[in-house]
Structures are given as C-alpha cells and as structure tokens.
C-alpha cells in the first residue's frame, strides 16, 4: 500500500512538473521605431569593455497604438564586452503626432559572431536572423492619453540597418 501511494505521488509530481504553463503572457503590437543615428563617439577600452556613445538624431514612430517622431538629442551608451556582446542602454524621446513628449529608456543586448558584428559596424545590411537583438523599453509619458505606457511592460526586437535601427515594440499582456 505504501509503495502504491508513493508511486502515485511520484507519478503525479512528475506529470505536474512536465506540463507547459497555461498562463504564458500574450503580446500586443504597439509600434515600430525607426531611429536615425550619427556615427559613434568611441571612448575606448574601459574596465567594462569598449565604450561607444551613439547619438540619436531623429526618426519615426508608426503603429496602431502610437505615431510620431523620434527627437534629436538622445544617445545609446553601449558597452561591447570582451565576449563581443553589445550591452545597449539608449535614452531618447519621441513626440507623438498630437504633440505629447514621451521619454524612452531602452536596455538590451545585441549578440553576434565577430564576423557579423564587423559587418554591422561597417554599415552593411545584415539579415537580422544572423544576430540576436532584443531589448526592454520603458516609457515615461505624462498623465493623459498615453498614461497606459507608464503601467505596462514592453519588449522589442531590433534590426540594425545601414541608415537606422528598426525597433518593433510589443506590450506584454
């Protein structure tokens, strides 16, 4: 009897731990940011890796939830680690088509082989399937129409193009 009970408990616990969670969050597409950049300022090698500051000089915001333009004046403060991974920390702002200014802080990673990273650095068009570029943007909007952006978690994919960075943003549901 004890062995049967132990077997049933073991079977149940194995079954319980192998089930796929049913409460995985969904995603809702918000917009695409096309961010224009100037050439980087290269600080050089630091204890953390190669520091680069990439000025953000403009761009567009298009999507079902928000539209507008990226304003001049932001930057991406990147560290390229010894393993070649670029740690991204971008701070910039957008202006919606109805005149609202929204601050963005975007933290992420771009992972590529040394060969792919060199092609990206030279400004070549590289298929985004050849590298991993993901980030977590945080929006800070004033009270009003875009206040919903203050109370949500977002994720994004990135694509480095020769003349911009394309960032597709989803709200985590």
What is the role of each PLM region?
Residues 19-173:
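Beta-strand-enriched cores of mature, soluble protein domains
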Residues 1-22:
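Bacterial Sec-dependent N-terminal signal peptides
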